[in-house]
Amino acid sequence: MKKTLLTLLFGCVVTAQAQDIIVMEPSYPPFEMTEEKGEIIGFDVDIANAICKEMNANCTFHSQPFDSLIQSLKQKQFDAAISGMGITEPRKKQVLFSEPYFPSSAAFIAKKDTDFAKVKTIGVQNGTTYQHYLAKEKKEYNVKSYASYQNAILDVQNGRIDAIFGDVPVLAEMARKHEGLDFVGEKINNPNYFGDGLGIATHLKNQVLVDQFNAALKTIKENGEYQKIYDKWMGGK
C-alpha cells in the first residue's frame, strides 16, 4: 500500500490535492458501515469527507479491526483513523487526537422487557473503552468480547448473552434496525473511561495534520455542514 508523506504535503504550499488514507472499522453504524456495493458509509465518513474537502485533500477509506487501529497508526501504515474512537488518557500516550467531533456516552441494550437486575452476561466490542470499563468497574458481570457487534446482536437475540454495552448512538441504531431490542438500565458518562468525546487519531508526531483537521472541523461546525451531517445520521438519537 502506498503511504502518503503528510509531512511533505502539509508542511508546504499544496499545489495539487493531497491524498489521505483514513482507516476505520466499518461495522459500527451509524458511525461507519459497509453498504451492499462494498462502499463504506456513515457519520464518520461524511464528517471526514467534509473535513478533507476543507483541507483540499482527497481522502480514501480502508477497513481494519478496531483493536488494531492504534497500532497501525503507530507504525505509520495509515494517515489517520476515524472510527468512533474515544479520546482517553491511555490512548493519548500512543496517538495524537483532533479536537472532539462527537460527545461520548455509554449504555446497555437487551431484549425488550429485560429486567436489568437479572443481567449476568454482557457483550462488548473488543479493544474498546467499553470493554475496559466493564473489566475494571463491573466485575460482577460475565463479559463476552466480539470483533464487531454483529455477532453480539445475534447472541442477545438468541439468549446467549443478556445485554450489549456500547456507545449510545450505535446501540440506538441497533435497536432501530432489530425489532425487540431496547435500552435497559441507565446511561453512563464516565470521562475517566470514555474520554472527552470522539476524535480523529494520527501518529504522535503528526501535529501538522491534526492542526489541519481541527481548523477544518471548526469551519464545518460554523458553516452548518456538521449539523447537516449530524441530522442525517443522528436525528432522533
UniProtKB/Swiss-Prot annotation:
* Secretion signal, residue range per the UniProt entry: 1-18
Q: Where in the cell is it found?
A: Periplasm
Q: Matching Gene3D superfamilies, A to Z? A: Periplasmic binding protein-like II
Q: What is its main location?
A: periplasm
Pfam families for the chain: SBP_bac_3
Q: Which InterPro entries match?
A: Iontro_rcpt_C, SBP_3_CS, Solute-binding_3/MltF_N
Which SUPFAM superfamilies does its entry note? Periplasmic binding protein-like II
Any idea which UniProt keywords this protein has? Amino-acid transport, Periplasm, Signal, Transport
Name one cellular component (GO) term: periplasmic space
GO biological process: what's one of them? amino acid transport
Q: What Gene Ontology terms describe what this protein does at the molecular function level?
A: ligand-gated monoatomic ion channel activity
Q: Which CDD domains match?
A: PBP2_Arg_STM4351 (cd13700)
Q: Indicate the segments annotated as coiled coil, or none if absent.
A: none
Q: What's its job?
A: Binds arginine; part of the arginine periplasmic transport system.
Family from the record: Belongs to the bacterial solute-binding protein 3 family.
Entry protein name: Arginine-binding periplasmic protein
Q: Which organism is it from?
A: Mannheimia haemolytica (Pasteurella haemolytica)
